[in-house]
């Protein structure tokens, strides 16, 4: 019994000694989070506005290779085989370079030009052709145009002009001012332009009050006048009698004065599409003009076919309010005997193309219409 007790005490002593000899395990310390850097407070400056001119414009194109002409502006191109021409178009230019005196044809379209400095044109007195389409020109200094006596063609389409430029050269033959913001025509601005053949003022802001009885005074040889896409309610007064082509589409014209076209012996082409014309606003024989060849009256409020000349070749009456058509009534030569199939076409009406679709008509084409207009090649209903 005593020996068993001694053995038990010895075993406990051995276990206690072994436990004291082992190292004590400590828990691993968790990594501390890195301190976040403190952001300095940003001062509250006002936000800048959207970029405005000229910062919103693309950069000008780099200069091209050296030219064979020492006076050629680096930002332009001077073709060796065409020494009188200067091409500065589509180069993101803000300013007009100095134009050499040898230049007759100047191309500056598709840029960001806002003005025409006098210094740029002081030597270019022989210019005949200037193309400034699609720029940002708001006004033309009359001192520039006064120094260009040989100018024949002036293109200023797609700019920001608010009035027709003054001091236009006397020898001008074509003046193109479409797609601007023009709402004013200075008095007498055309008075010295006897050589002008074409005047294009479409897509502007011209109203009836702009046109006075003397607005077109001086345009003795004008052949083409384009006033389409404006805000006219009346026919313009005192249009030059030499006119051949008259464009008045997309206005708000409601009526044509009696005998309005009688004073135009050379008028061959009329466009009055997209207006507000009705039978009440069309006096009898309004379009019965001896030299008229093409007449556009589509997209109006016309309910009957107007009287036409026997020389008319193309008639557009589509998209109106026409319900019926009587060939006997509209026949210029008042043909009654439809049994006459004579081959003599000397006095037969010249109408070759007739468009009537978009009305209230239904096929077939009336027989009396075909008997009158025997030269018809196409009828659209």
UniProtKB/Swiss-Prot annotation:
It is found in: Secreted, Extracellular space, Extracellular matrix. Disulfide bonds join 331-372. Glycosylated; contains heparan sulfate. The keyword 4Fe-4S does not apply. Residues 19-65 are annotated as: Disordered. GO terms for cellular component: extracellular space. Residues 1-21 form the signal peptide. One of its GO terms (molecular function) is heparin binding. Transmembrane segments: none annotated. Residues 25-39 have a biased composition (Basic residues). Gene3D superfamilies: Ribonuclease Inhibitor. SMART domains: LRR_BAC (SM00364), LRR_TYP (SM00369), LRRNT (SM00013). Keywords: Disulfide bond, Extracellular matrix, Glycoprotein, Heparan sulfate, Heparin-binding, Leucine-rich repeat, Proteoglycan, Repeat, Secreted, Signal. Residues 56-65 have a biased composition (Pro residues). Pfam families: LRR_4, LRR_8. LRR repeats lie at residues 94-113, 114-137, 138-161, 162-182, 183-206, 207-232, 233-253, 254-277, 278-302, 303-322, 323-361, 362-381. The basic N-terminal Arg/Pro-rich region binds heparin and heparan sulfate. Binds collagens type I and type II through its leucine-rich repeat domain. Belongs to the small leucine-rich proteoglycan (SLRP) family. SLRP class II subfamily. Binds the basement membrane heparan sulfate proteoglycan perlecan and triple helical collagens type I and type II. May anchor basement membranes to the underlying connective tissue. This is Prolargin. The lineage of its organism: Eukaryota, Metazoa, Chordata, Craniata, Vertebrata.
């Amino acid at each position: 019994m005593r020996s068993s007790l001694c053995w038990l005490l010895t075993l406990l002593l051995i276990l206690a000694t072994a436990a004291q000899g082992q190292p004590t395990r400590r828990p691993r310390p968790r990594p501390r989070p890195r301190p976040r850097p403190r952001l300095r407070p940003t001062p509250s400056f006002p936000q800048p506005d959207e970029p405005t001119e000229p910062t919103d414009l693309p950069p000008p194109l780099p200069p091209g290779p050296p030219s064979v002409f020492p006076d050629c502006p680096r930002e332009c191109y001077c073709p060796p085989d065409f020494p009188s021409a200067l091409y500065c178009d589509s180069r993101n230019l803000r300013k007009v370079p100095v134009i050499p005196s040898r230049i007759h044809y100047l191309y500056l379209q598709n840029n960001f030009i806002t003005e025409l400095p006098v210094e740029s044109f002081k030597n270019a007195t022989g210019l005949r052709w200037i193309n400034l389409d699609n720029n940002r020109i708001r006004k033309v200094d009359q001192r520039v145009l006064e120094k260009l006596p040989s100018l024949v063609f002036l293109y200023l389409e797609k700019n920001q002009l608010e009035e027709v430029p003054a001091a236009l050269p006397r020898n001008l033959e074509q003046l193109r001012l479409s797609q601007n913001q023009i709402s004013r025509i200075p008095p007498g601005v055309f008075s010295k332009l006897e050589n002008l053949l074409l005047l294009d003022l479409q897509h502007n802001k011209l109203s009836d009050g702009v046109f006075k009885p003397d607005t077109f005074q001086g345009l003795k040889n004008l052949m083409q006048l384009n006033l389409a896409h404006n805000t006219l309610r009346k026919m313009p007064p005192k249009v030059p009698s030499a006119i051949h082509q008259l464009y008045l589409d997309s206005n708000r014209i409601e009526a044509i004065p009696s005998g309005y076209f009688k004073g135009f012996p050379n008028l061959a082409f009329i466009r009055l599409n997209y207006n507000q014309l009705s039978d009440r606003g069309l006096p009898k024989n309004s379009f019965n003009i001896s030299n008229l060849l093409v007449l556009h009256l589509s997209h109006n409020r016309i309910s009957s076919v107007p009287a036409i000349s026997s020389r008319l070749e193309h008639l557009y009456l589509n998209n109106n309010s026409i319900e019926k058509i009587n060939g006997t009534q509209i026949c210029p030569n008042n043909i009654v005997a439809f049994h006459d199939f004579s081959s003599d076409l000397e006095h037969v009406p010249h109408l070759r193309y007739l468009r009537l679709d978009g009305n209230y008509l239904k096929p077939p084409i009336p027989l009396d219409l075909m008997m009158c207009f025997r030269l018809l090649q196409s009828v659209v209903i």
